[in-house]
Amino acid sequence: MKRIMLFLVTNLAVMLVLGVVLNILFSVLGINKSSISGLLMFCAVFGFGGSFISLLMSKWMAKRSYGVQVIEQPRNETEHWLVSTVARQAREAGIKMPEVGIYDSPEMNAFATGARRDDSLVAVSSGLLYSMSRDEAEAVLAHEVSHVANGDMVTLTLIQGVVNTFVMFFARIVAGVISNFFSSNNDEESSSSGGFAYMITVFVLEMAFGVLASMIVMWFSRQREFRADAGAAKLAGRDKMIAALQRLSRGAEPQMEGSMMAFGINGKRSMSELFMSHPPIEQRIAALRG
């Protein structure tokens, strides 16, 4: 689950920065905010830009954020097994060998990240390696390799880009309507204060619409989890995948944050399933059992 939350947080930060830049460009270039086509074009450029910048930074940020130690040369039997298992699964899935790494954490989790299928990273926590059986860990690795093979990060990026575009677009449309409604005159002072109020309103609306839009992203994320589970069942075996999920259900709630969350094996619980990046484990097991 680590991967998606880090992605979303990075994307949000980039969106906020680009949103400020967008407002400045409107003023400098004299673009009419009421021009729907021009506004939509700019929002699309910056909306998709934020997503793709997050995507390109995803592997670098994952390594830095979680202290992932990439295995260059296996130093022990566990690392040998880890690298050889991922290599075998990558061949079977038809992708290039991902980088393989370990990060220090007591929780049982793993994630995959990377901008392309053939330039990816699969990382596992030390807690997973020492708490799971080899069969269970093999299924977890297969789940992450399936995320890479399915191109899930690129898919999420495209979805997030569309969501970003419409969040930015409708925030500015609604802010413009509100600003016009409360404008009583066009004197210089009113114009100056009105511009500031418009920017604040846009910021607040982007936050509000962003929360609502995240439900769309999370829904797609949950569908990709079911697909990754099915892929893992093919690569490692259905019984191993079910056993791994059952083992995860008995463990502590993961503490992953950021974009890593969606592409980890396990996700955080939420008051509402609408905001969960992963389906409940019992649903995932039921789907595997058919």
From Swiss-Prot:
Its EC number is 3.4.24.-. The active site is at residue 144. It comes from Aeromonas salmonicida (strain A449). Binds 1 zinc ion per subunit. The keyword Ribosomal protein does not apply. Belongs to the peptidase M48B family. GO terms for molecular function: metalloendopeptidase activity; zinc ion binding. This is Protease HtpX. It is found in: Cell inner membrane. It holds the Pfam family Peptidase_M48. Its cofactor is Zn(2+).
